[in-house]
Amino acid sequence: FDTEKLLDIARTAAKHGIEMLVMDDGWFGHRNDDSTSLGDWFVNEEKITGGLKYLVDEVNKLGLKFGIWMEPEMISPDSELYKEHPDWAIAVKDRVGTLSRNQYVLDLSRKEVRDCIYDKIHAILSSANIAYVKWDMNRQLTDMGSLMLPADRQGELAHRYVLGVYEMQERLIHDFPDLLLENCSGGGARFDPGMLYYSPQIWCSDDTDAIERLGIQEGTALIYPLSAMGAHV
């Protein structure tokens, strides 16, 4: 896709009363498929010609809000960030890491890792009138080892990792109080009260079949309010 294709979609959406255009995966780094660029959170201006602010402003002129997809917790082996900091990925010392979905998981128990990724997110959100962020997390945690923790404290990593995610999202909603943050994890794998503290809605499921969604949302509604269930057209 490119800027003109996105604006064409936005024009059609505006005619049908849709209120927000969300730009999904593929807008950053050098990403043309799922094998590259997670961690390189800068705009690919070969696709987003004219820059992100121009695109967002043009979408806003059509009466639509603008949203964006990110997967801040992940890193691609084929990324500038991984080439600079291969030790930032979660891994057991002296073992080859497990690659899943062509990506590794960043060690968000480490402050320097959180700060680096957060600064990149902050720069993107500060550059344009972005109303919504879909924070995705698409793979399981494996190879649970941290190069920063001593051997007798490796068991703390999973807990410290989640606390790191919480800290980043706390900063996000503090710095951008009008932002709508939606959590997602391969669908609804993170639909829990901890994440709802930071995001008022969570992506309910990657199954968007209208009939199948009825059962999914009925079951989710036994515990959670309907307003918390995210769904896209």
Model regions and ranges:
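Glycan-recognition surfaces
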Residues: 76-115, 159-233
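Aromatic-lined carbohydrate-binding/catalytic grooves of carbohydrate-active enzymes
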Residues: 1-118, 132
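Active-site and adjacent substrate-binding regions of carbohydrate-active enzymes
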Residues: 29, 44, 57-61, 112-195, ...
